[in-house]
Amino acid sequence: MTTTSLGADAAHTHAMVPSAIPPEGSDAAGPDDTLMQQMQAACAQACRAIAPAWPLDRAIAVNPHWGRVDMPVRRVAARMAVLGGIQVFPTRRSQQQAWVAGRITPADLADALAQLPAARAAGLTEAKCVEALRRHELPPRLPLLIDVLDNDPQRHTRLSWRQAITHQVSQTCAAYFDVHQADWQPERADGLYGFWRDTLQHDHGIGLLMGLPDLGRRLDALPATPLDAEHWALNQLGLPQPVWADYLEAVLLTVNGWASWCAYLGWQAAQEGREDPHLRDLLAIRLAWGAIVQECRDDASTRMAFAALQAEWQQAPSALAEAEAALLVDEVWQLALEAGYQRQLAHRLAGAGALPPVPQDIEVQAAFCIDVRSEPLRRALECVWPAVQTIGFAGFFGLPVAYTPLGTAARRPQLPGLLAPTMEVSDRIDAAQGPDGMPDPAAERAAERARRHRLGASAQVDGASRWPSAAFSYVEVAGVGYLGKLWRWLRPSTEARSRADLTGLPSRYRAVCRPHLHAESVETKAALAARVLRAMGLAEHLAPLVLFVGHGSQTSNNAHAAALDCGACCGQTGEVNARSLALLLNEPPVRAALQAHGITVPEDTVFAAALHNTTTDEIEGFDLDRLPPAARARWDHLQSVLKHASDQVRRERAPSLGLDPRAPHDDLLTQLRRRANDGAQTRPEWGLAGNAAFVIAPRHRTQGVVLDGRSFLHDYDASRDHDGSVLELLMTAPMLVTHWINWQYHASMCDPVHLGSGNKLLHNVVGGSIGVFEGNGGDLRIGLSRQSLHDGQRWIHEPLRLTVLIDAPETAIERVVDKHPIVRQLVDNGWLHLWRFGPQDLQRYAAGQWRPLTSRHATC
């Protein structure tokens, strides 16, 4: 399609664009193949730009710009500003505050200018950068069709068309995708587009609300398929073909929340080897809405607005280029903010040992998740008892599994969202407690029946309270039973964390209900165990007690509770993975089979599982009845160590939660438990707020260093990784996961309106677990709430890009960067910083070369 030349008057421009909706079943000739291919390519390109958003019950952090990381950060910032009015870099107002407060120093600004060749080429100086902070506005956004149509003389007498369309599309999606909340489910046979079309044709009030009395008649002729709707709407616009994809991406950004949900459905489908049409359907719906409104308006103001739209989009390439140039100063300030943190980080790491300490007798090895909340506890534990060696590893512990709780049909992934499960874990009931407990099929069947009965009864009660015919009578009969709930709300308990996976299971079975990994053979189990132990660095020198410590949170009345659990376990706690792995490695046949893989597990080595409650910093052990006497004695001794270490961490965290760090141990724990069980508490913990670095190195590089709970820590010993395969795994899995986490926090803070979920107090859950509305409408909200980032007086998080530090040879790191395009994109396009531990100092990777840090940074 060639560029449409604009005529002098609007009427002529409007006449050039076909405006009649093709009737269904018409014999008109279709578009030529080339035009259709171009349209399909533009739609596909726009859809690829949308990152997925996981449901609430599997909430994991995602970089909302994931579909754009093949471009430099500043170019993405320009596109998001011009196409969606979205802020990518920290606001200039916040940077000005950091400058005035001294958080960003002149040295930081000079360092940022030195790092950015484009800034030097553009003649930017420190004075010019400071002057730019006085101008706070984003580059102007290009309008969409509905924007120019909405800006008519009668706009104050009716509902805003853009808001009305967003609301209608959002409510339609909420009804269509809901499978948990409504008792009466919609008809989905015709897909999302067909459902929307049918819903709109039966909504006789929306035309009056929008001031479009002719809307109903126009709707009768809507194209029957989403493909026809896309072609019709694009043809209606008459825009030049080179800007189609940009315009379509801008259209999707108006319903970015639902687009992200549809992208998640597409992500899941791709993992299963199939396609999902929902994102294309949503694009067709949003495109068609603009064309419908245009059809209903045919006056001078509409024609002038349409001509203005075409004129502005003719200039889209230059608008994007101008925005990219204007945002250069924002990139400088982003680097300056990061330079201050990086200087402090380098200085602290310089105090750690460059060489491993002299080996001593290790009583306990404890593998923790790499999560930033594990760092303070690991440091405290090593300080309290030097005979403990802590290890950092991804919290799913290398198990590519999905878990099915006993007596349920639920199946949930327990691994990073980047991966698909290839193995299964389910619960088993043992005949009795103790080291020699064997499976008891009869007890398992009885437990399943009892659980199904209890869960079924609970579902019936819930259902009775929702039906219109029973709602009032239910309150009369059962209302008094809610007095206990009301009391617990008014006076939150100080109970320890409850285990949701045991809901409905009779108490007599709980102690003997254990998750077990299913595998075809002992050899399959042994091969998996060998890979995990080698990746953890535990293929040799095993301690008598090896502990796998997953983590989970404890909150009440929190729609985003899963976001505080383990991201590596797909928004679940790490309990299932830790227990499954420990039980697997304690199986005698598996230990014997490990010999063939070159791993000898000493007879006195026992594996155990535990969970770190990140809200209260308590440690809970599992399957302790399976421990032999010697291992149980070590565990019992470890309890006093854990108590002291946990108390130290709680005192570190107390000021950020408004608590007194000098309070007695028991009082502080009680206060944290009460916060965790308080349904009105919007900030039970800070999650991963403050995250800024990822260290892939032996523990001695960070041991004893106070990293303030801001660093992900993954153990890695390059001397044992002869072929670089472990490093490759770490840079293509955990590094991507930490990048996703880092950018979700970054985006939610830089633009909380578009990329955050707003105010927790106004959240309403959509579809049971899909997401939330802020209030009762608008787009689906994605990202983090304001309360996850701000304490009411100040921001807890700083929007810094992740600094990744690796202790490995230059060539090994470069080999991974060169082999994997996604890693190359993240590094070269400025989505993260890549550093390494050099022989004498820290080195930064830039423009394909390793360069020592400036003299302003400390050496290691």
From Swiss-Prot:
Its main location: membrane. GO terms for molecular function: zinc ion binding. It comes from the Bacteria. It is found in: Cell inner membrane. InterPro entries: DabA (IPR018752). Signal peptide: none annotated. Pfam families: DabA. Keywords: Cell inner membrane, Cell membrane, Membrane, Metal-binding, Transport, Zinc. It is a peripheral membrane protein. Transmembrane segments: none annotated. One of its GO terms (cellular component) is plasma membrane. Its cofactor is Zn(2+). Zn(2+) binds at C369, D371, H551, C566. Residues 1-32 are annotated as: Disordered. The keyword Iron does not apply. Forms a complex with DabB. Belongs to the inorganic carbon transporter (TC 9.A.2) DabA family. Part of an energy-coupled inorganic carbon pump. This is Probable inorganic carbon transporter subunit DabA. It comes from Ralstonia pickettii (strain 12J). The gene is dabA.
